[in-house]
Amino acid sequence: MATTVHLSSFSLFIQSRGRRDNSISSVKSLKKRTGLSPSSALTSQGGRDMIPPQGKSNDHNSAFDFKLYMIRKAESVNAALDVSIVPLREPLTVQEAVRYSLLAGGKRVRPLLCIAVCELVGGDEATAMSAACAVEMIHTSSLIHDDLPCMDNADLRRGKPTNHKVFGEDMAVLAGDALLALAFEHMTVVSSGLVASERMIRAVVELARAIGTKGLVAGQVVDLSSERLNPHDVGLERLEFIHLHKTAALLEAAAVIGAIMGGGTEEEIEKLRKYARCIGLLFQVVDDILDVTKSTEELGKTAGKDVMAGKLTYPRLIGLERSREVAEKLSREAEEQLLGFESDKAAPLVALASYISCRND
């Protein structure tokens, strides 16, 4: 009989800071739209169970090392990305611009998520790798475009000058476009023969939907139109829309695609969709917190950029302490979606939620 995940064996008690505020009602709208209730942390009482930062269980029987797992998966993804890009040829500049951003490192959270989910439902790394690389290509494309002067006007990304600072705005736009096209080409060509055609079509549709006007693009549009708005005139519903679409949508797609490629059941796919939606929002809440609590050197990108741009963020809307409470609750709700899966196979995903909530960059 399969062993199920026990949250208590991956828990660490963290005392919530400050007093709980029971006056925020608009946060509850998220549960209606997503089937989740991450913001219910705003009305919670007492301490919360959290996972240790390195993803290691407090249970002496568990030897899972998430840090090592993450390093190994990142190495596999980096190697696959390196060979996925065609050899340099004319026009050289755009090829160099593509490689500059795609191979700049990073935590590779999205491809790791795709692979871990595929393995959880019975697949393997080889089956998921092309899709995982496609997700990272699209993520990198979105970062290149997001950093442009007409968008966020950022100078640093992953500790290096942004693409347009090195290659110019025109070449950065084209590099982002090229990565977007390469993602779908790579995913479909490399996976041919590994995955049934109907599953591949479903995965492609899932990914396309996540980055179009029903996903990432929609989030970016609302994000840009919300700059300089008075936070007192904007509810949490607008902020949650931005983050559900701009950040969570691609993480959700990474998980769902991994489940599809691995042959997951409909029930498994939906549970993992909810899990990814939780960690997607969690990722952005933590990102908002880090933007106002860490330095540029620590983040590898310009700290305080969102504040300077007048963007809507969780700390700006509900304060730093309540933002931490929301992050804490999201991590717990993500873990809850993994109940019923084999504990050994689910361990990377349990630890990933912890890693995102505890990350410092």
UniProtKB/Swiss-Prot annotation:
Compartments in which it is found: Plastid, Chloroplast
Residue numbers binding Mg(2+) 2: 146, 152
Matches recorded under SUPFAM superfamilies: Terpenoid synthases
GO cellular component, one term: chloroplast
Keywords associated with the record: Carotenoid biosynthesis, Chloroplast, Isoprene biosynthesis, Magnesium, Metal-binding, Plastid, Transferase, Transit peptide
PROSITE patterns linked to this entry: POLYPRENYL_SYNTHASE_1, POLYPRENYL_SYNTHASE_2
Binding positions for Mg(2+) 1 per the UniProt entry: 146, 152
Disulfide bonds listed in the record: none
Subunit organization: Monomer.
NCBIfam families: FPPsyn
Role according to the record: Catalyzes the trans-addition of the three molecules of IPP onto DMAPP to form geranylgeranyl pyrophosphate.
Protein name, as recorded: Putative geranylgeranyl pyrophosphate synthase 8, chloroplastic
Species assigned in the record: Arabidopsis thaliana
